[in-house]
């Protein structure tokens, strides 16, 4: 792993939360793949500014075949992506993010946390503080969409047929994606 020293993934400090979300109203979530929340995934040097942090996270994701696509916050309305899995790294600040659609599970995230959302997972920013900023990335070859309505049966089948990413966005050839997603794919 060649991560920028400004952000150092440290598997020994990771606290992993894994959970599945059932379909909820118009939000499909993902029946096979769990949400993976990497707490303390990135040991971020507090002396570097947010732009340097974001660039270092982008380099890490790029190295692991998850090309970064944007820097911003998370939309404050419920939505999901049907054409791509998504990884979100918290560059600065902290927030409460709802996963699963309206009435879903609230995840409190802070600087250095990473959220891995399988395609179909509803998410929405509930509240944020401390100049909340995120880097968003998607597996190589997957183009994200923004959905706010139910999928057709054909779209649902396409979503469930998306290929597995080739590596974990944080740890590469090892890590939670390999453990939890590949295991789920064999069920």
Where do the PLM segments sit?
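A short beta-loop-beta micro-motif enriched in histidine and acidic residues
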Residues: 73-87, 102-103, 110
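A generic structural motif
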Residues: 98-100, 126
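A short, N-terminal "cap"/entry segment at the start of jelly-roll beta-barrel domains
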Residues: 1-79, 178-187
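Short, conserved beta-strand element in jelly-roll/cupin
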Residues: 81-98, 116
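Double-stranded beta-helix
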Residues: 67, 73-74, 92-94, 102, 126-187
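A generic "binding-loop/recognition-motif" signal
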Residues: 94, 103, 121-122, 130
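Conserved metal-binding segment of the jelly-roll/cupin
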Residues: 109-129, 138
């Amino acid at each position: 792993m060649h991560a920028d020293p400004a952000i150092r993934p440290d598997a020994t400090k990771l606290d992993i939360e894994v959970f599945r979300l059932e379909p909820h109203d118009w939000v499909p979530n993902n029946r096979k793949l769990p949400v993976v929340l990497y707490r303390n995934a990135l040991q971020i040097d507090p002396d570097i500014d947010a732009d340097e942090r974001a660039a270092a996270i982008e380099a890490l994701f790029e190295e692991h075949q998850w090309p970064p696509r944007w820097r911003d916050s998370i939309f404050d309305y419920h939505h999901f992506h049907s054409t791509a899995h998504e990884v979100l790294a918290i560059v600065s600040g902290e927030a409460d993010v709802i996963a699963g659609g309206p009435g879903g599970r609230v995840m409190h995230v802070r600087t250095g946390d990473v959220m891995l959302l399988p395609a179909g997972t509803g998410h929405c920013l509930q509240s944020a503080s401390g100049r909340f900023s995120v880097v968003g990335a998607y597996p190589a070859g997957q183009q994200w969409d923004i959905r706010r309505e139910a999928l057709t049966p054909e779209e649902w089948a396409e979503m469930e047929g998306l290929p597995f990413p080739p590596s974990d966005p944080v740890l590469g050839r090892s890590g939670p994606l390999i453990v939890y997603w590949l295991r789920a794919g064999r069920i």
